[in-house]
Amino acid sequence: MLKDSGREKISDKRIDSPVSDDKFINKLFERLVALKVEFKNVDFRYCIFDAAYLRNCSFEECDFTGCRFINCNLAGCSFNGCKFDYASFDKSQIDNDILDVGCPGPENLKLKFARSLRMNYQQIGDAKSANKAISIELQATEDHLHKAWKSKESYYRKKYKGLDRLKVYGEWLEFKLLDLIWGNGESSWKLFRAVLVVLLIITAIHVIGFGNPSLVESYVEALWMSPQVFLGIVSP
């Protein structure tokens, strides 16, 4: 049985004066315009902002829980003490300092928030902001997986029991292993270190199996050959 969701559509409106202690819950704002407007303690829960132009506005203690920002321009906006639980962003211009002041507290919500912004920045070609979001997403993912199997917090112990707890422990181990090897794709130094370790192992195996461990020349020759063995160009 289909019922009306009760979402009100507000199209082609402009806000030109400060807004304080107001509620706009479950609204669809289409092409909303505001420039250098102050919003204080405004409730925007579950709103959808479609093609909104909100440049250089300030938002203080506003609630954006469950909001969606689609094709919006939020450049120059500041957010202080705002709530972004379950908020998502799609092809929207927004300064990356929101990652410093807007992340939700719980790790599972923080990683979803950072992931949404990371994908958003990738969509608009902002590599620097995407990298910043990735760093926060990875740290939040590690913290979430660690708490999921180890924390005594009621949320985690209620959600992850028995085999689910064991499974998430395996995911945490995999995450830590990939972080150790190559920083989950974000650390060139860790990748270089991992390759160097592999080359040294190949060198040691070659010297023990085919060279003379008492001769320095055997180590030099084996080390010289190790990249070719690693790449499959030659056989040991």
Task: Set out the residue ranges of the language-model regions.
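Tandem repeat scaffolds
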Residues: M1-I136, T141, K150-S151
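Transmembrane alpha-helical segments and their cytosolic interface motifs
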Residues: K159-G209
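Pore-loop/selectivity-filter region of tetrameric P-loop cation channels
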Residues: I181-N184, G209-P236
